[in-house]
Amino acid sequence: MTTIYNTLTRQKEPFSPIDPENVRMYVCGMTVYDYCHLGHARVMVVFDMIARWLRECGYPLTYVRNITDIDDKIIARAAENGETIGKLTARFIQAMHEDADALGVLRPDIEPKATENIPQMIAMIETLIQNGKAYPAANGDVYYAVREFAAYGQLSGKSLDDLRAGERVEVDGFKRDPLDFVLWKAAKAGEPAWESPWGNGRPGWHIECSAMSENLFGDTFDIHGGGADLQFPHHENEIAQSVGATGHTCGHHHAQTHHGQSIASHVKYWLHNGFIRVDGEKMSKSLGNFFTIREVLKQYDPEVVRFFILRAHYRSPLNYSDAHLDDAKGALTRLYTTLKNTPPADPMPSEAGDDYTRRFYVAMNDDFDTVKAVAVLFELAGEVNKTNDAQLAGRLKALGGIIGLLQRDPTEFLQGGAASDGLSNEEIEDLIARRKQARADKNWAESDRIRDLLNEHKIILEDNAGGTTWRRG
C-alpha cells in the first residue's frame, strides 16, 4: 500500500485513487521563455519518479504536465528579442524536451499548451460569473471574488485575514477585495489577445491549469503536483476556480483545516516538492544564484544530476553545490563500478535478493522515500561486491531502473564525462597504449609521466592481470 503526504490535509494518507482503472496526475509545468533551471529539473525528475513508481505498482496512470506558452514574461522576452511569441516558445519547448530527455525524464502522456485551451478557459470564467464567484470589472478585466469561496486559504493553511495581513497585495481600485485575483486580462496594445464576452484579452495564469485539467480529467482527479512555491497563490487559486465552477469535490472524510474550515478540493492528493537552495538561500534569478540545467550538464553527467535529486527526499530542501554534486558523482560511480566488476544476469527469485526488493518497495511506498530506497541499492551493491553474484547484480540494475537509474553500460558511464575534462576517449586510449609500450620498454619515467598527465585530467587507471582499465574521476 502506497502512502502519500497530502499537503492539503498535512498528513500521510493511503493512496486510494478515485478510479483505480484510471489514475490521473496533473503537474504544473514550465513557462517557456528561458532555459530550464535546476528547480525545474527537480520538478521534472521528482514527478517522473512518482509516475514510474505508480506504474510499477500496477496503476494505469495518465500523467499530464502543462506548458504555459502565454504570459507576461513571455510577451516581454519576445519583444526584447524582437521575435514572435510563437518562435520564442517553440524554441524553449524544444530546449525543455532536450533537458528532460537528458535527465532520463519520460515524456508525460499529454502536454497541453495554454494557447490551445483558450475556449475552455473562457467557458470556465463564464460559469464562475454565473455562480457568483467572479465579476467583470470596469477596466475589462475579470476577477475571482475570494470571499465568495468559503474554503479559500485551506491549502496554504491561512485565513483570508491572515493572507491580507501577510501578503504584499498590489492595490487595484477595480477589485472588491485586495486578494481577488485576475481570471481574464483586458487586451493591451501590441499584446496577443483573444475574443471573449468581456472584450479582447487573454487569460490569467491561474485559470489556465483549472481549465486544462478539467478538460482532460473532468471535475475531480487524483494527484496534483508542483513545486512548493506554487502552493500559494497558484494552487490555492486553482481549487477556488475548479470547485467554484463545478461544485464537485473529492471526499476528504470531513477533514478540516486548522482554523475549522471544511476542506473542499477537486483534487484528492496535493503533492509539493521542496526548494533548491544555494548556500542556504532559495535559488532564484533575483538573487543571481541561479543555474540552468544546461550549465550544470557541461560539468556533470545527466545521470549524476538525476541521482543528486533522488538522493534527497522530494519534500526536503535540496542544497546545491559542486561538492554535493561531486559527492553524488562518486556515489553513482561506486554503483556502476559494482555492475562493471560483476556483469548483471537476469535475477531469479532468491531469499537475499527478494529481501532487498521488499525493502526497496517498503521505502518507495512510504511517500516515495528515495533516500531509503537508494540506501537499499548501496547495501545490495555491497553484497554484490562481496559475493560477485551476477543475479544479485541483476537485481541491483532492475531496482535502480524502477527510478530511472543504472541502465547504461557501466563502462560507458565510467568513461563518459563532461567534455570540459579536456581529453577525448580516443586520446585517453592512445595515451594508455603509449604508457603500455613505455612499460614494455622499461621506460618508467615515460610511463609515470603519462600516468601523471592522465591524473591531471582526472583519469583513474587500474592495472590488472587483463591489462589497464580506466574511468573518469
Curated annotation (Swiss-Prot):
Subunit structure: Monomer.
Nucleotide-binding recorded as keyword: yes
Domain of life according to the entry: Bacteria
Cofactor(s) this protein requires: Zn(2+)
Biological process, per Gene Ontology: cysteinyl-tRNA aminoacylation
MF annotations from Gene Ontology: ATP binding; cysteine-tRNA ligase activity; zinc ion binding
Residues annotated as binding Zn(2+): 28, 209, 234, 238
Extent of motif 'KMSKS' region: 282-286
UniProt enzyme class: ligase
Name of the protein in question: Cysteine--tRNA ligase
Catalytic activity: tRNA(Cys) + L-cysteine + ATP = L-cysteinyl-tRNA(Cys) + AMP + diphosphate
Cellular component GO terms held in the UniProt record: cytoplasm; cytosol
Alphabetized UniProt keyword annotations: Aminoacyl-tRNA synthetase, ATP-binding, Cytoplasm, Ligase, Metal-binding, Nucleotide-binding, Protein biosynthesis, Zinc
Location in the cell: Cytoplasm
Coiled-coil residues: none
Family per similarity comment: Belongs to the class-I aminoacyl-tRNA synthetase family.
Residue ranges of the motif 'HIGH' region: 30-40
Cofactor, free-text remark: Binds 1 zinc ion per subunit.
Pfam families linked: CysS_C (PF23493), DALR_2 (PF09190), tRNA-synt_1e (PF01406)
